[in-house]
């Protein structure tokens, strides 16, 4: 039975003939069409909708079809009727929406799902008929009684798993700049006692995880870095400052193909102190501050259609790094440099407020403290051509471990514009592991111009990296 009166369904003619085959009962299923044209959670069907079916029931009763089971076609709506006991006909029919919290089971054991469905329930009927959010709820209304898996999938899609490892993505974006600053300082020769180095770069990466609720992604980044160096009278002794920005786009491997854009800028200072006259043993300390502006376009599947929500947030950070390295010259062109380093970082991530879209979320502001020791070794090669250009190559491997709370931080979200409580987002389990990273770079240096290409791999997240850069020294 269609419940809206628009494009009404017709009763089955001569259904009472089934009694001749021994069938004495039948089901009458009431659809949810009326919910498309109403924001109410309680709907009474009109007499004009019921009457044709009463005629069908009366005619079938005369033929011996005497029992009728009447229920809703929808998992999330319940049909209730009052019947005339004498004639078995329907006097009144009502549709009542089942609260989404019912499908979260025991709220004490499924608190996160319960809190989300509580917010979802509060959003029902808020937006106007014909809006995209209303269309989303229509999709949920159409889920059938035996299609509970579709409802669970829709809940999971809408809960904002794209924000699950937001801390790691913010940190990895900053790491791109750190790596480029390192290239400027260590891989390119200094032209004079006071040098200015500028480099444009582009890079690509991929992150994979086995943690449930954390989504794989690829990223593409490009940007510019600048470094000013003041070298002292003693080889290796100097100070300087650096700055740069990176624009990093993450493309998630979820069903909707969500996308996040990060724009981060850094500015910092450093000081290098040699411990011998040929600068084979050197200690460098650096510190910087960062500012980020980020946008999320979260896309999610509900039944068979993609919906989306858009949010923005800012980041603010400060970091301090100490590195001690020792150079061993193996041949005229080849050197080996083992080193140890530790980086301390504090990052504040502002509240994410999704301003547009469907089932918008608020993600609670948070922060992380990173303590990351690293030990590694670089094998460097340098060859001077007859033209004066220099061919450089570097193969490096290092082990680093995160001792702070980056992925361990509790990220929480809630359905925006509701009084529902916060629910927890998944944590990246792989962050408990250390990371072995391997990098190879190849460059050509002229007196002023130069370029590099690099590739790398991280065991944590099975992260593949590749990039190119062009620089100017003056």
What is the predicted role of each segment?
Residues 192-196, 233-241, 279-287, 332-338, ...:
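Outer-envelope beta-barrel architecture signal
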Residues 1-2, 19-29:
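Beta-strand repeat architectures
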Residues 138-327, 454-465, 469:
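Outer membrane beta-barrel translocator domains of Type V secretion systems
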Residues 2-4, 8, 31-222:
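Outer-membrane translocation/initiation segment of Type V secreted surface proteins
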Residues 292, 343-347:
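Solvent-exposed flexible segments
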Residues 212-217, 253-259, 295-314, 348-369, ...:
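Solvent-exposed, glycine/polar-rich loop segments of beta-barrel outer-membrane systems
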Residues 8-22:
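Short, T/G/N/S-enriched strand-turn elements that build extracellular solenoid repeat scaffolds
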Residues 265-268, 362-474:
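Outer membrane beta-barrel transmembrane domains
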């Amino acid at each position: 039975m269609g419940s809206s009166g628009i494009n009404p369904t017709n009763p089955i003619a001569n259904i009472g003939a089934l009694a001749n085959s021994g069938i004495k009962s039948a089901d009458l299923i009431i659809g949810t069409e009326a919910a498309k044209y109403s924001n109410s959670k309680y709907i009474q069907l009109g007499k004009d909708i019921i009457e044709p079916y009463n005629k069908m029931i009366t005619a079938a009763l005369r033929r011996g079809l005497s029992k009728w089971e009447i229920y809703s076609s929808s998992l999330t709506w319940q049909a209730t009727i009052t019947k005339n006991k004498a004639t078995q006909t329907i006097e009144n029919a009502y549709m009542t929406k089942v609260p989404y919290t019912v499908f979260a089971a025991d709220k004490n054991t499924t608190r996160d799902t319960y809190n989300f469905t509580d917010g979802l329930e509060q959003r029902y009927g808020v937006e106007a008929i014909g809006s995209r959010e209303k269309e989303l709820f229509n999709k949920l209304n159409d889920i059938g009684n035996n299609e509970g898996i579709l409802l669970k999938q829709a809940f999971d899609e809408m809960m904002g798993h794209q924000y699950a490892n937001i801390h790691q993505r913010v940190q990895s974006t900053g790491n791109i700049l750190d790596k480029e600053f390192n290239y400027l300082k260590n891989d390119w020769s200094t032209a004079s006692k006071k040098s200015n180095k500028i480099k444009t770069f582009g890079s690509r990466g991929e992150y994979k995880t086995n943690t449930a609720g954390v989504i794989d992604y690829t990223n593409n980044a490009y940007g510019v870095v600048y470094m000013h160096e003041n070298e002292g009278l003693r080889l290796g002794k100097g100070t300087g400052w650096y700055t740069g920005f990176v624009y990093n786009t993450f493309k998630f491997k979820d069903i909707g193909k969500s996308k996040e854009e990060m724009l981060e800028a850094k500015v910092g200072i450093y000081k290098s102190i040699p411990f011998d006259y040929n600068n084979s043993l050197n200690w460098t300390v650096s510190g910087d501050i960062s500012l980020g502006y980020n946008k999320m376009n979260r896309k999610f599947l509900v039944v068979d259609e993609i919906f989306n929500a858009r949010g923005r947030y800012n980041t603010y950070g400060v970091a301090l790094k100490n590195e001690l390295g020792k150079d061993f010259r193996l041949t005229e062109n080849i050197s080996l440099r083992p080193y140890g380093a530790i980086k301390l970082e504090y990052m504040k991530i502002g509240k994410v407020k999704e301003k547009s879209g469907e089932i918008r979320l608020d993600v609670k502001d948070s922060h992380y403290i990173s303590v990351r020791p690293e030990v590694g070794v670089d094998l460097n090669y340098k060859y001077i051509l007859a033209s004066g250009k220099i061919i450089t190559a570097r193969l490096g491997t290092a082990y680093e471990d995160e001792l702070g709370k980056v992925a361990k931080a509790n990220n929480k979200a809630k359905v925006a514009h509701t009084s529902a409580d916060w629910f927890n987002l998944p944590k990246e389990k792989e962050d408990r592991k250390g990371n072995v990273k391997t990098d190879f770079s190849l460059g050509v240096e002229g007196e002023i111009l130069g370029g590099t290409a690099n590739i790398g791999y991280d065991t944590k997240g099975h992260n593949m990296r590749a990039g190119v850069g062009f620089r100017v020294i003056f």
